[in-house]
Amino acid sequence: IFFFALIPLLALLGIHMYKYFTDKELECKHCEADGIDPAFMQKVDKLRGELGFAFPITSAYRCPDHPIEARKNTPGAHASGRAVDIAVRGDQAHKLLQAALNAGFTGIGVSQKDGVRFIHLDDLPDSKERPRPHVWSY
């Protein structure tokens, strides 16, 4: 826990927590807040390293005021800081799905139609509001 408290200080010093992802791509696109869960991102970073191909993150942390979150009755997985959307398609999408299931990600959303192709990953615990494990399509 102490280590994770040092993350903002490390960022100020130009030291990044993750091998494959920048702080900028993980912050809220609405307000630039840094709310991503470090333990969650360590899992994503490890997955990226194992697969060996780029994971362009289109959405990570979203503050409660983010337009997508503000439309919801209760904040979604992104507002918890434990979700990312990864732009991926074709055989890489297939490889990512297999690896994410093996790595223990509990929420997997798939959008592979038209120009919007991404896979949502989260690791939320099972709850009445959000049953996990769960897979859905957009």
Predicted regions located by residue number:
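Flexible, active-site-adjacent loop/turn segments at secondary-structure boundaries
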Residues: 19, 24, 59, 64, ...
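Active-site acidic/histidine clusters and adjacent loop/turn architecture
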Residues: 12-54
